[in-house]
From Swiss-Prot:
Belongs to the HypA/HybF family. This is Hydrogenase maturation factor HypA. PANTHER family: HYDROGENASE MATURATION FACTOR HYPA (PTHR34535:SF3). It comes from Pectobacterium atrosepticum (strain SCRI 1043 / ATCC BAA-672) (Erwinia carotovora subsp. atroseptica). Keywords: Metal-binding, Nickel, Zinc.
Amino acid sequence: MHELTLCQRAIEIIEQQAQQHGAKKVTAVWLEIGAFSCVETSSLDFCFGMVCRRTLAEGCQLHLHQQEAECWCYDCQQSVTLLTIQVRRCPQCQGDNLRIVADDGIQLKRMEIEQEI
């Protein structure tokens, strides 16, 4: 279950950023998940709750957004978007000579904090 490892790394980054900004608590986190990242969102949600325990992010609200796959089609020389991992054909020319440009990871997009007074 690589979701646990991803969450552990995300919490490290979240804690680091929260401390740099003088946070006493992280209240919400927005993560973007790539369409081809092979991340199961329900597992990610469960693991995130576990790794947040006894951190500044404990009890925070997790918002997940599924990113579409951005690809380059070598057949028609177009930048295209794939909507699901099951469809690996260019929506423009139906070619299968695609290179994934962006979408295979997980990114911390935003976080809300309560600052110390």
